[in-house]
Amino acid sequence: SDELTIEAIKNYDCNIIYQDSRGYGDALKKGIETVETEFFCIFNADGSFDPKELNFMINKLKNDKYDFVFASRYEKNCGSDDDTFVTFIGNYIFTYLGKIFFNLKISDILYTYVMGRTSCAKKLELASKDFSFCVEFPIKMKLSRMKYTSIASYEKKRLGGKKKVNAFKDGFLILSEMIKLFLRYKIIGNSKI
């Protein structure tokens, strides 16, 4: 599918960036590292994100001086056509753990529809190469005392591609990452990100 993606976008005015390693988190890290603009946005190519929400997100960053804006499928007047019962329950549990362990005030920890200040994202020293990136990013952002907010978002049914998340395998990786970060920054007391 990588070749199909490259073929589909090669006629557009965009840079194609190749990963050094493999994995969802590695792709997002590599993307953030190469951004040269003031703001960046993680935006899935499967058609599930609503581009109409981008203007609202950028206005939150510029006018309200937030460092990051997280979209959420679990605010009022929003939802998802792509969520399953298992992913909904898993996300609820991980979001709850984010609140308990780190006082993280977002309602959809696994939804990586995020816009933010590039300079702030580059300070986070992100390391996850897999789907645990979804929790590492907001947790390190919170631990770094950056200013953030959530907005309501509606996730549409994907237009193309297959869901690559394995709810149980990736759920275990995500839980392991949360425990690791909790032990490192809250129990052992390493304050440096």
Where is each model-derived feature located?
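Catalytic donor-sugar/metal-binding loop of nucleotide-sugar-dependent glycosyltransferases
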Residues: 104-105, 126-129, 138-156
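Acceptor/aglycone-binding surface of glycosyltransferases and processive sugar-polymer synthases
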Residues: 19-34, 39-42, 51-131, 157-175
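A conserved acidic beta->alpha catalytic loop
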Residues: 1-6, 47
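Hydrophobic residues within well-ordered alpha-helices
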Residues: 9, 61, 141-143
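Hydrophobic packing residues within well-ordered alpha-helices of enzyme cores
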Residues: 5-9, 57
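Terminal low-complexity segments of carbohydrate-biosynthetic enzymes
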Residues: 173-193
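Short, structured coil segments at secondary-structure junctions
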Residues: 12-13
